[in-house]
UniProtKB/Swiss-Prot annotation, chain A:
Gene: URM1
Composition-biased stretches (Polar residues): 33-48
Record carries keyword Disulfide bond: no
An example Gene Ontology CC term for this record: cytosol
Organism per entry: Laccaria bicolor (strain S238N-H82 / ATCC MYA-4686)
Function: Acts as a sulfur carrier required for 2-thiolation of mcm(5)S(2)U at tRNA wobble positions of cytosolic tRNA(Lys), tRNA(Glu) and tRNA(Gln). Serves as sulfur donor in tRNA 2-thiolation reaction by being thiocarboxylated (-COSH) at its C-terminus by the MOCS3 homolog UBA4. The sulfur is then transferred to tRNA to form 2-thiolation of mcm(5)S(2)U. Prior mcm(5) tRNA modification by the elongator complex is required for 2-thiolation. Also acts as a ubiquitin-like protein (UBL) that is covalently conjugated via an isopeptide bond to lysine residues of target proteins such as AHP1.
Keyword field: Cytoplasm, Isopeptide bond, tRNA processing, Ubl conjugation pathway
Similarity comment: family membership: Belongs to the URM1 family.
Protein name in UniProt: Ubiquitin-related modifier 1
InterPro entries noted in UniProt: Beta-grasp_dom_sf, Mopterin_synth/thiamin_S_b, Urm1
Domain of life: Eukaryota
Amino acid sequence: MSTDSNTMFLKIEFGGGLELLFSNQRSHRITIPSTVPADNNTSVTTKDAASPATRPADVTYLLHHLRDHLLKEREELFMENGTVRPGILVLINDTDWELEGEGEYLLKDGDEIVLISTLHGG
Amino acid sequence: MSCENPSVDKDALMARRPKFDKTKQCVKCKERTGNVVIRHAVYCKSCFFPLISTRFRKSLEPSVNPTPDGPRRKALKASGSLLVGLSGGLGSTVMLDLVAKTYFGAPSVADLGEEAPPSKPKGGKEHPRNMTGKDSEIWRGVPAVCYVEVCGAFPGAEDRTERVRQVVESYATTSPPFAFDFIPLRLEDAFDLEWWKGVGELLFTPPPSSTPILALQAYLSSLPTQTAIHSATQTLVRLLLLYTAASRRASHVLLGTSLTSLSVNLISGIAQGAGFSVAEEAMEEWRGEGKSGELTPPIRIVRPLRDVGMKECAIWAWWCGLRIVGRERYLGGTQGIGSLTRNFITGLERDYPATVSTIARTCAKLTPKEGSDGVCLLCQRPAQHGVQEWKSRTSIRSYNHASFSSSGHERPPHLANATDRPQHRTEPSPSSHLTPHLCYACHTTLTSRSSRGNVKQTSDSKVVPLPLWVGASLSLVPTSEDSSGEVWATRRMGDGEMKAAIGDLLLNDS
Ligand SMILES: [Zn+2]
Ligand SMILES: [Zn+2]
């Protein structure tokens, strides 16, 4: 899908009300770099000479990217201590991210990532 | 140990277990690769649906028949109709879906698994009880879905009634279609004579010139803390559902309390003095007074998702494509007991998923040492004898008390300007009171002081309206003592034992 081997294409879905923090849009298609700064800084590109430490893009980086570029409000309802807030589930290609290494899962071009809030209660 | 948020330093206290045991293979079919981890166990998508619906049925079906089955399991046959409480939140939306699919012929969950083609008919042989008609063989009549809109209590909150209606009506468009009766209520109905006339008996003179919404707001704003407003709101919702259920001759009211929410309710309930009725939070039976004054047949309040966590609910909703309307979380602010407990339990569930079910199971075993000797007039749960004396022994009720004056203790700063509520007003019989007819939790809800100061004191009126079911037990008549007509005294029907002022209890503190 991606024509540029330096980037990858991802499908992002929000559910359970989490979309309210993301312009109330449930489905997003985004492109992120394949190699990212080790400190999860999403405002620089790895081509910058100033950030030599890099690693392959993983879910933790994606969460920072979503927070920095797609999140519209109330960051504290999305992330906490460098990961998603308790009560937010992540599915990677329809599978619980707990089976896939959580934040350490290395993203592949075309992956579908679903983030669902359980905080709307019952 | 300090009182800091325990989730912060938890790793220092308890080693984190791996999220799943051994392999990524499904523990059920032992074939497919797993898709979800539930309390350390791995399940594939095909095994997930029967797992959840089995837990749902195991929690519900043993309480369907009026008397427990003997050694041989009889067919399920309820003594009345079914009422499903729907809040618009995740748990109750999933519960409604399970009810529709399990008992009323909505397309089966098995059809949603990857293995089963969508056209496959429901497993009729395996589930002979399942019906595809207008009502099931289990409950009488058409089942109702009841929604209580709470926006009247929270200025600026969205009215979600129509969106919830769409959720309920979506089951009328499935194949085969099934139409629930949708009953939209509002929190202020608890103060609305028109609603009460439909479900209860009018034995008293209603307060003049107050709309239900103003009465609701006056009631809530009289409460001492945000936490109290939260629990009072929950109590109103619960009794609106129960009286509605009684008016439909329901034998069962289903609530979508998940394992996660149950644990939150249990812990925050205990924190707010509701320890006596902890067992009721898991399973309870209620009898109201019917329109002609006699007790209605018992209604069972069942929480069929009490063994299903929020995570499983969210995954069910996602895989089934359910739309979650969302609900107002009236938790009493971010520092309210409800919010703090929910944050704690949610964090606990992520990091130590088995502990949350341990909380629920442990609390379900709790039974009070002494039996109840009555029913609380406000929440209509079993009440414990002697709440008033007990409270007076264990808590500081007045800084004007002689022993404090003589000991030279000073008032804490936040009470420095407060005047104590007079212990007695000029009632006909000061010793009789609403207090003896309240449970400890409701008494606390109505009277506790907050260490952070009380919430807004908006109302000048001295006496506050109460939900109509309280007034139906005590007859309300205006007194002539106050020419403004704002003071209400209460007089019990019959022997006058409860000649008392509700107003004394509900007076603003300062
Ligand atoms: Zn399986
Ligand atoms: Zn009570």
